[in-house]
């Protein structure tokens, strides 16, 4: 009964207004009041401040500064093996596995299509038919910067307006097409492992979604799909390395990764609800050509 009430409230509450209010409040610099709010939040959600570059909560001017806090250098080592991709964020796996033609599992008895997730872009959708996906949920206690699973060159960024349902196991199991309905930022990369999509999904009280190359992508929420294309090289190119920060959430939410067919395989033992840490191995190369190229690069590496 309680779950039904929670889901009903998700449909009834003015989510955009609440999100705007939360974003406004989280940006306020209110001195001791800000510190009290941060201390209360850290206590309720058991945030490990010893991992933060600034463990003293008084050092954060606003709640958002605290929420996107950087970690101490080296606290999240990135798996060094060149044939491995790493988790982009701290959190827990919501779902993962094979894409069934164009259908992605959201929760038991719920799925959604690639085209719906990718805002109707059938060209990008076709790249990932029968591929693999990983959905990572970031809880309030987690580190909320998002990193690159592997080296990548950005080709497209697409902002998709949408709903702002909360994202958690309850809504995933009860709100159809949750990730294809919520506001999101889609990033398509060329990588050594073939095309890869990394999607930052918004939610209720997610004040903003940012990328390192474009800054704040949302807000403003203008209600229209926006697309930016990027060159492979030269001025305007966005070239990132494995483990580099690529974006961040201010209050939220979920990261979805898509991989092309027969390019990578997920690491053994991963399952729904597995805890993730940025930099730990998520998948490894499956394509023999990729492995051969990586081996050749290692053989010619002259680094002392």
Swiss-Prot record:
Post-translational modification: Is synthesized initially as an inactive proenzyme. Formation of the active enzyme involves a self-maturation process in which the active site pyruvoyl group is generated from an internal serine residue via an autocatalytic post-translational modification. Two non-identical subunits are generated from the proenzyme in this reaction, and the pyruvate is formed at the N-terminus of the alpha chain, which is derived from the carboxyl end of the proenzyme.
Topology in membrane: Peripheral membrane protein
Signal peptide residues on this chain, from the entry's feature table: none
Keyword Lipid biosynthesis set for record: yes
Domain of life: Bacteria
Active site location: 90 (charge relay system), 147 (charge relay system), 253 (charge relay system), 253 (schiff-base intermediate with substrate)
MF terms (GO), sorted A to Z: phosphatidylserine decarboxylase activity
GO cellular component: plasma membrane
Primary localization class, coarse: membrane
Pyruvic acid (Ser), modified sites: 253
InterPro entries, per database record: PS_Dcarbxylase, PSD-B, PSD_type1_pro
Catalytic activity annotation: a 1,2-diacyl-sn-glycero-3-phospho-L-serine + H(+) = a 1,2-diacyl-sn-glycero-3-phosphoethanolamine + CO2
One example of a Gene Ontology biological process annotation: phosphatidylethanolamine biosynthetic process
Record-marked site positions (Cleavage (non-hydrolytic)): 252-253
Free-text remark on how the cofactor is bound: Binds 1 pyruvoyl group covalently per subunit.
Subcellular location(s) per record: Cell membrane
PANTHER family: PHOSPHATIDYLSERINE DECARBOXYLASE, PHOSPHATIDYLSERINE DECARBOXYLASE PROENZYME, MITOCHONDRIAL
Cited function: Catalyzes the formation of phosphatidylethanolamine (PtdEtn) from phosphatidylserine (PtdSer).
HAMAP family the record matches: PS_decarb_PSD_B_type1 (MF_00662)
NCBIfam families cross-referenced by the UniProt entry: PS_decarb
Family classification: Belongs to the phosphatidylserine decarboxylase family. PSD-B subfamily. Prokaryotic type I sub-subfamily.
Protein name, entry field: Phosphatidylserine decarboxylase proenzyme
Gene designation per UniProt: psd
